[in-house]
Amino acid sequence: MLDNLTSKLKKLTTDVKESTHSLLDDAGKVVDRAFDKHICIGVTGFSGSGKSTFITSLIHQLRYSNEAGLASFLAAREQRILEVNLLSSQGFDLFDYQEGISALSAKPPQWPQPTQSLSSVIVQIVYKRNSVLNRVLGETSTFNIEIRDYPGEWLLDLPLIGQSYLNWCFDQTDLAKQAVRKHLLGDLLQHLQAINPFDVFDESQIKQLHQQFKRYLRQCKEEGLTLIQPGRMLLEDEHNESPVFFPLLGLHHYDKTALADANDKSIYKVMSQRYQSYIDTIVTPFNKHFFDDIDRQVVLVDALKVISGGQDNFEDMKTWVGKIATFTYFERTKANSYRHPLFKAIR
């Protein structure tokens, strides 16, 4: 009994320490934001849209800001930048700035490798103050610009949060009516339309159709389409253990109440559960833990490629942009709500 009590006390002590460290870390972030000492920028876009090139260029401009001619960067214009350092961000791989520079400066120049996972870099700017507060706060100050890079394919899934499997299937059914998607689906379209949602779930059959659906998603991307869900299925070797599911494209023929009351072993119920599991275990944690600290969001779109793909591709992009623009990414704190423009924070 004493050993059990001792074990519980140790666990309680550990939990208290972890909670305290987490609280202090969060408090530090709030203080930094309140005094304009830190800003976090999220950068995303489909693979090939230029994220790595954009971030490499942005870091390079900030590192050599005294020579870059950044009109809005007053401290740089007045030659008050003392040093710029690149730091790692806790919990993220370091963005490979040097690889980007090497690729762009090679002979002949090459594009940097596309983003396949999360990465981040903190650009720490040390500068001389130009303020009446110099006597109180000191002549120099530090401002951190954190840049987070992540695949745009991850962003595609965020609108799924709060959307039921049934409504997602209805959306996918409407998309399948587009000529380009109908062509890409081929025989798979008839298979997904013909499935009886009340039939008993057959794992082997579902896995075969799942592989065909993944190939269809990749073909959509190759054709320049933008609204592709689930987006994680586009990334090779990414989340191989994620739930196996796909949309049923004939659900408009069935009564909604009957579908809701379907047997737990039916195709519809199992698919619904796996869809929700995908959202709960993959999409929601990404939204909660990644976006909570982001102050600005940059989304890069290869508009020229989309436009050259035709009217369907253009309308597809408009729908996608509309979905991500209206999605609530995170709950903003008060310290996060009254942000100054980026370079206004460096005075």
Positions of predicted regions on the chain:
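Hydrophobic anchor at the beta1->P-loop junction of P-loop NTPases
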Residues: I41-V43
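Switch- and interface-adjacent substructures of P-loop NTPase systems
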Residues: A27-G28, F35, Q61-A345
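N-terminal pre-Walker A segment at the start of P-loop NTPase domains
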Residues: L2-F35
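Post-Walker A alpha-helix
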Residues: F54-I55
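Conserved glycine(s) of the Walker
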Residues: S49-G50
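P-loop (Walker A) phosphate-binding loop of NTP-binding proteins
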Residues: F46
